[in-house]
Amino acid sequence: MNTSAPPAVSPNITVLAPGKGPWQVAFIGITTGLLSLATVTGNLLVLISFKVNTELKTVNNYFLLSLACADLIIGTFSMNLYTTYLLMGHWALGTLACDLWLALDYVASNASVMNLLLISFDRYFSVTRPLSYRAKRTPRRAALMIGLAWLVSFVLWAPAILFWQYLVGERTVLAGQCYIQFLSQPIITFGTAMAAFYLPVTVMCTLYWRIYRETENRARELAALQGSETPGKGGGSSSSSERSQPGAEGSPETPPGRCCRCCRPPRLLQAYSWKEDEEEDEGSMESLTSSEGEEPGSEVVIKMPMVDPEAQAPTKQPPRSSPNTVKRPTKKGRDRAGKGQKPRGKEQLAKRKTFSLVKEKKAARTLSAILLAFILTWTPYNIMVLVSTFCKDCVPETLWELGYWLCYVNSTINPMCYALCNKAFRDTFRLLLLCRWDKRRWRKIPKRPGSVHRTPSRQC
């Protein structure tokens, strides 16, 4: 929404001339009604999607959820009451309803701006301070920041709108009109426009520019890293030495030809796995290493002992068993494999950086769409606010009405931005609209399963 309503700048304006024809009234009513319906439907889809699809329950999407709540309030109350105001040509619902509408409208509008600032700062710190910031980036902290954004918006607008007339001792709002009393002076309206629109937009654009520059720098670093890799070396090779660990002291090794009578099931060893999580914008590598700290690229293969059934009975003699053969890198093996490990480490680092870059670009794309929609829909009205400060009669009444409504349209566009830039939102919207949401298991499945190596058992 906007920072000030048209009557706040020109209190003596008749909102809609009573002489409007029935076709004009019908056109305005149908158009605004459809916009209100689209706004409510779109933002309800966002809320329901967040509820049913656990893949969307991420820290970044908590801010989008808060923004959708503000847009839902605007679509449900602000749009419809303003349409009534336009069609009737005067405010007929009383002074209390007027003040409550204005308070709700301005609190929700300011909360939208605050949420956009939170999204911008969240993306900025995630890109520029990935280690320190993401350690503190939890759902609880996100909820706290969202709560503060709404609290600040409420404190700034609601008390002043509701109680200003009691502070000054009289109500100066003209009969049949609805606007904020303390914004009747153009200079005050100009100040609120600067603080509530131009300053936040400047901060958002600056942060987005910094995010763009940082993302481009990372893309160049990734290209340089990938270009320095040597193909065909160190893809999965590891040099290791085998050490025999007897099952008991003094027991000889099992002859090569001996067959086990009891075979263990195959063991699964995970060398590394990708974690893809919308909440974290980077993939993380996990390595299975020995207790002595092998490098992530090394592979540990444990062969379980094959114990004879007869040897399991209690006896004074130590049981005979096949040796525990542990295949693990040694210092000597590492020295020989040093050249092969480096390319593998670079390959894993390149994969991690690629995944991080993809996530950052996707989040930046969503942010850019939201910011672009916000700037395009809010700028015309706020330009008219500046013009009216120096020339009261230079802005036609029709432009005021269009500019005011265009601010509302931003709440209609935001859910479309989520769907266009986020495949998870888009797929969930489609399933909900087709009434097929119950046919899908809303459970997050890792998109990059870990690479699992199977150690085969001995064949009898």
Curated annotation (Swiss-Prot):
GO BP term (any one): adenylate cyclase-activating adrenergic receptor signaling pathway
Residues of this chain annotated as glycosylated in UniProt: N2, N12
Domain of life: Eukaryota
Bias kind Low complexity: ranges: 238-247
Subcellular location: Cell membrane; Postsynaptic cell membrane
GO annotations of cellular component type: GABA-ergic synapse; glutamatergic synapse; plasma membrane; postsynaptic membrane
Extracellular topological domain residue ranges: 1-22, 85-95, 165-185, 391-401
Cytoplasmic side stretches: 49-62, 122-142, 210-366, 421-460
Disulfide bond is among the record's keywords: yes
Residue stretches spanning the membrane: 23-48, 63-84, 96-121, 143-164, 186-209, 367-390, 402-420
One Pfam family it belongs to: 7tm_1
Modified residues (Phosphothreonine): T230, T428, T455
Cysteines paired by S-S bonds: C98-C178
A GO term, aspect molecular function: G protein-coupled receptor activity
Membrane topology: Multi-pass membrane protein
UniProt keyword annotation of Cell inner membrane present: no
Cross-referenced InterPro entries: GPCR_Rhodpsn, GPCR_Rhodpsn_7TM, Musac_Ach_M1_rcpt, Musac_Ach_rcpt
Bias-annotated ranges (Basic residues): 328-343
UniProtKB keywords: Cell membrane, Disulfide bond, G-protein coupled receptor, Glycoprotein, Membrane, Phosphoprotein, Postsynaptic cell membrane, Receptor, Synapse, Transducer, Transmembrane, Transmembrane helix
PTM-bearing positions, type Phosphoserine: S451, S457
Function: The muscarinic acetylcholine receptor mediates various cellular responses, including inhibition of adenylate cyclase, breakdown of phosphoinositides and modulation of potassium channels through the action of G proteins. Primary transducing effect is Pi turnover.
Entry similarity comment: Belongs to the G-protein coupled receptor 1 family. Muscarinic acetylcholine receptor subfamily. CHRM1 sub-subfamily.
Subunit structure as annotated in this protein's UniProt entry: Interacts with GPRASP2. Interacts with TMEM147.
Protein's UniProt name: Muscarinic acetylcholine receptor M1
Organism of origin: Macaca mulatta (Rhesus macaque)
Gene name linked to the record: CHRM1
